[in-house]
């Protein structure tokens, strides 16, 4: 059985857990403390970040998008819709944008005190500009391309969720992102998010095995 080292609130680990749930892949979940990472995790992934997926054959996958892609490869019908070439390219471009730019600004908005000479409001506005552009690509559907979740949805959801958490009242006001707001609210109320955000006790080597997901 694969083993997933995870941390509940980490957006990258959330990506991995959503992919595992949607692909109906059962793993042993090891919830870790980011301040006291287990030696068994550090030995297989020296970069010391979650998620880390240890496969049955000994392979290590320690990038969230690569875990999503592994799940897709092993569960061809993981997503109900088959995307066309343009949709696939759009999805990959948006995911790259979030990983390289949105996350950069999000950290400096949400955790401004950790950085020197940072104007949190300007980084918040940079995130909002990205969301306003993205908002035009959701039109009367629950997800980006249809009413069915796809790779792009689970890849950007954790970061948009964090963006809202930083100031919910501000986010929920009229910010020019009505479709994104509806899209996010749909996910916040979804079974998918409820499953992936379930609480797990911190893993210890002698603890009983905890399986994820538990309610397929």
What does each model-identified segment do?
Residues 1-131, 135, 139-142, 212-215:
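GST-like domain detector, emphasizing the conserved glutathione-binding G-site
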Residues 186-205:
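Charged/polar, low-hydrophobicity segments characteristic of intrinsically disordered regions
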Residues 133-137, 157-158, 162-164, 188:
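Catalytic cores of nucleotide-enabled group-transfer and carboxylate-activating enzymes in metabolic
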Residues 200-216:
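Acidic/histidine-enriched, glycine/proline-rich intrinsically disordered or flexible terminal extensions
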Residues 136-147, 192-196:
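Surface-exposed helix-capping loop/turn segments at secondary-structure junctions
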Residues 148-150, 179-180, 201-203:
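Small/polar glycine-rich anion-binding or flexible loop at a beta-alpha turn
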Residues 146-169, 173-176:
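GST superfamily/GST-like fold recognition
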Residues 122-127, 175-189:
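Extended, well-ordered alpha-helical scaffold segments
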């Amino acid at each position: 059985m694969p083993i997933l080292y995870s941390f509940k609130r980490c957006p990258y680990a959330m990506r991995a857990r959503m992919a595992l749930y949607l692909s109906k892949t059962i793993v042993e979940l090891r919830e870790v403390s980011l301040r006291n990472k287990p030696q068994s995790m550090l030995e297989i992934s020296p970069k010391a970040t979650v998620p880390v997926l240890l496969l049955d054959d000994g392979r290590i996958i320690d990038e969230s998008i690569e875990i999503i892609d592994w799940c897709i490869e092993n569960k061809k019908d993981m997503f109900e819709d088959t995307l066309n070439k343009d949709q696939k390219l759009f999805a990959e471009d948006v995911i790259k944008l979030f990983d390289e730019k949105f996350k950069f600004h999000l950290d400096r908005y949400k955790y401004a005190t950790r950085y020197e000479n940072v104007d949190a409001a300007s980084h918040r506005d940079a995130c909002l500009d990205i969301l306003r552009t993205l908002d035009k690509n959701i039109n009367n559907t629950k997800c980006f391309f249809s009413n069915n979740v796809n790779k792009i949805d689970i890849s950007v959801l954790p970061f948009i969720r964090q963006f809202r958490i930083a100031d919910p009242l501000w986010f929920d006001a009229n910010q020019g992102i009505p479709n994104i707001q509806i899209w996010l609210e749909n996910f916040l109320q979804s079974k998918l998010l409820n499953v992936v955000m379930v609480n797990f006790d911190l893993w210890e080597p002698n603890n009983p095995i905890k399986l994820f997901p538990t309610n397929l």
